[in-house]
């Protein structure tokens, strides 16, 4: 049997992701491939960073797209912020809270679980009880909008609670970014990750992430190496940092980043965050 070119049928995608990709994004991805250190491509990377800062509503310098799907963005956050022996409170109300636990334990951390029924939001009172019971906890992790059930939790309140007990936060926004109000700086989120294939309507394969200065300081103060060479932010940001000469780290998925760039331009053009009532644009 001779295999010929694959021509996928047109579908209207109604699952939890991937979502439909616009012709604008598909066209952008078909443009000529550049070298991953080409000045034109590096300039586009800077634009992706700026557009992600807008979409996350943050000024975090440490904002970029991991060259892998959302699960790698999750692992990037946990691998960089957790050292062996760290106690981490994980809120689980669906499948992806369970994956957070897996990441904590694979990093050598100790996971303290706060369980809520699938389909319900994370209960802030339960989180507060766990924080009181474990004063040595250093991190709180939760899913903003649980893909497996559609339940959305009150991220602002959960982050505020964590900070009251001097914990950093890791927040999964794979489903919620660009689909529901999300204010990284205003809410004080320390580390956040998402995916390109949900509300951003770009193809799968990239994971937007952002880390504030508190998170960056914890990473800088590590006494052990990050488990993953590929996801070690101390190395990755030599490529994405945007200051001076770029250091080669890996070959970026050039055409996929063209697509993400175009989808983020479309988010910007929608004026999601425009006064006087930006939240109304999500309704």
Language model features: what each stretch is:
Residues 1-38:
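N-terminal "arm"/small-domain region of PLP-dependent enzymes with the aminotransferase-like
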Residues 20-21, 197-272:
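Active-site C-terminal subdomain of aminotransferase-like
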Residues 82-98:
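Conserved PLP-anchoring active-site segment centered on the Schiff-base-forming lysine
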Residues 122-178, 191, 199:
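Active-site phosphate-binding strand-loop segment of PLP-dependent enzymes
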Residues 184-197:
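Conserved active-site segment immediately N-terminal to the catalytic lysine
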Residues 273-283:
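Single conserved hydrophobic/aromatic residue that forms the stacking wall/gate
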């Amino acid at each position: 049997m001779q295999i010929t070119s694959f021509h996928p049928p047109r579908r209207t995608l109604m699952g939890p992701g991937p979502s439909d990709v616009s012709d604008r994004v598909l066209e952008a991805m078909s443009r000529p491939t550049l070298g991953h250190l080409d000045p034109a491509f590096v300039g586009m990377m800077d634009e992706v960073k700026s557009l992600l800062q807008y979409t996350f509503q943050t000024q975090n310098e440490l904002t970029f797209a991991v060259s892998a799907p959302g699960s790698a963005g999750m692992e990037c956050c946990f691998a960089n912020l957790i050292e062996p022996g760290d106690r981490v409170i994980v809120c689980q109300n669906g499948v992806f809270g369970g994956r957070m636990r897996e990441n904590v334990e694979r990093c050598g951390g100790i996971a303290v679980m706060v369980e809520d029924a699938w389909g319900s939001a994370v209960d802030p009172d339960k989180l507060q009880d766990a924080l009181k019971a474990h004063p040595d906890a250093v991190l709180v992790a939760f899913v903003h909008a649980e893909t497996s059930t559609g339940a959305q939790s009150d991220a602002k309140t959960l982050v505020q609670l964590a900070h009251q007990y001097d914990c950093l936060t890791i927040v999964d926004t794979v489903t919620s970014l660009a689909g529901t109000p999300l204010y990284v700086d205003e809410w004080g989120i320390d580390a956040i990750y998402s995916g390109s294939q949900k509300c951003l309507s770009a193809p799968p394969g990239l994971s937007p992430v952002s880390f504030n200065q508190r998170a960056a300081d914890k990473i800088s103060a590590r006494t052990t190496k990050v488990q993953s060479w590929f996801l070690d932010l101390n190395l990755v940001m030599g490529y994405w940092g945007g200051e001076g000469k770029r250091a080669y780290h890996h070959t970026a998925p050039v055409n996929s980043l063209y697509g993400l760039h175009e989808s983020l331009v479309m988010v910007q053009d929608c004026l999601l965050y425009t006064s006087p009532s930006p939240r109304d644009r999500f309704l």
